[in-house]
Amino acid sequence: MGESIKSKYTPIYPSKYQGNTKHIICRSSWERKFCQWCDMNNSIISWASEEFSIPYVSPKDNRVNKYYPDYLIKVKEKNDMIKTYVVEVKPYKQTMPPKPRSRKTKSYLTECVTYAVNQAKWKATKEFCEDHRIEFKVVTEKELGIR
């Protein structure tokens, strides 16, 4: 996923950020690009990065874990309605089930586990969003205009 360079983001418009502006962590260049978009976009009223958690059951160990969605954003729509979104930034490849292979390599098994864990997180997030009248979006390199 993008370059896996962890960095801190300092917003140009800190009043839009909901949380501690000194602790905005970007775990990839793609997340950094999304932070910049949130910060600079006039339609974004407020945004937060990893500021809350959603419990989910991991298929990896069948235990309850905490999932911290990448972003929570409030957007002023064209009709002047305010809409809230939970946003996860992920490579498109991780949003699709791994293609079956004849050899079950370590890499393939890791892809399978990653996909299963993501699906569990996103199922819990969709349920959370339905309960709170929020929309869930997974943003990939396609939406970010990368590649």
What residue ranges belong to the model's regions?
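Electrostatic, structured charged patches in enzyme active sites and in nucleic-acid/phosphate-binding
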Residues: 1-147
